Amino acid sequence: MTEPKDIVLKESEEIEGTPIEGPWLDEVRILEEVIDYYHRIGFQATHLGRAIEIWKKVEEKRASGEEVRVFLGYTSNIVSSGLRELIAWLVKEGKVDVIVTTAGGVEEDFIKALKPFILGDWYVNDAEMREKGINRIGNIFVPNDRYIEFEKYMIPFFERVLEMEKERGKPLTASEFIYEMGRFMDEKLGKEKERSIIYWAYKRNVPIFCPAITDGSIGDMLYFFKEERGDRELIIDVANDIVKLNNLAVTAKETASIILGGSLPKHAIINANLFRGGTDYAIYVTTAIPWDGSLSGAPPSEGVSWGKIRAKADYVEIWADATLVFPVLVWKVMR
């Protein structure tokens, strides 16, 4: 019979690897030096450290003249938050080549160029909020007058789009529609447009794809526009956008997929990369779990099984709120 002590104090093999270690505050003076320890801290800090390494590798390749086409996907709540300005900066600086987002990721960017969203609280009486006409996104408040103001701009924009479609004899794709929104912002809005993702995508000719363009306030405004005018001519084409998006992946020498959140943007990007044998680099930032079989929670390794991420790709998934980790990730890679 094995002695209890021998069971508890079982001999082990020695292993090689990175020692777990955190910053000793007497030895660090700036935040950047603290972040340098992340890959050695363990848990999700290590995943963030790995994401920094992957994105830096992509940036180094691009700086040396190698082609790595960067796809960025994000859900609407990312734009609801202060991450909007980080993404706009990335587009402005030429760090992103292709964007996929939801309808909210488009319209909230435009709305914020009109009036800001307001920091609120998670714990409020939501029935009272409704009575006051204040919408809540977590602890971010959006007074309904933002959407009233948005409609004032969208109706003349729709009229412009309708005339464009009549002149060219075919509908705009969703990415063309968003490009024209950027042009419209450039013409109609003031300095605040310079914090806008759509504006800089227009200026830098970065396509923004939105396969579910009507699933939000833009869809609401289209409904009002069509019902009030009896219009059945204004159409947004999503079918031809899938060709454009897929070909942007197919024609790239290498691709990197950076995805904040899950849902449609995540799948649109990795599915486009399926047609080229998978993306070469992938960084996921998510709070979704894989246990329910959802696409949002599917880890990169599951994407490998579908051919959407290459088996030898550099990839990592960070399980965290993107508002916590994305600013650190961008700062460390870009600065």
From Swiss-Prot:
It catalyses: [eIF5A protein]-L-lysine + spermidine = [eIF5A protein]-deoxyhypusine + propane-1,3-diamine. One of its GO terms (molecular function) is deoxyhypusine synthase activity. It comes from the Archaea. Pathway: Protein modification; eIF5A hypusination. One of its GO terms (cellular component) is cytoplasm. The active site is at 308 (nucleophile). Keywords: Hypusine biosynthesis, NAD, Transferase. Pfam families: DS (PF01916). SUPFAM superfamilies: DHS-like NAD/FAD-binding domain. Its EC number is 2.5.1.46. Its cofactor is NAD(+). Belongs to the deoxyhypusine synthase family. Catalyzes the NAD-dependent oxidative cleavage of spermidine and the subsequent transfer of the butylamine moiety of spermidine to the epsilon-amino group of a specific lysine residue of the eIF-5A precursor protein to form the intermediate deoxyhypusine residue. This is Probable deoxyhypusine synthase. It comes from Thermococcus onnurineus (strain NA1).
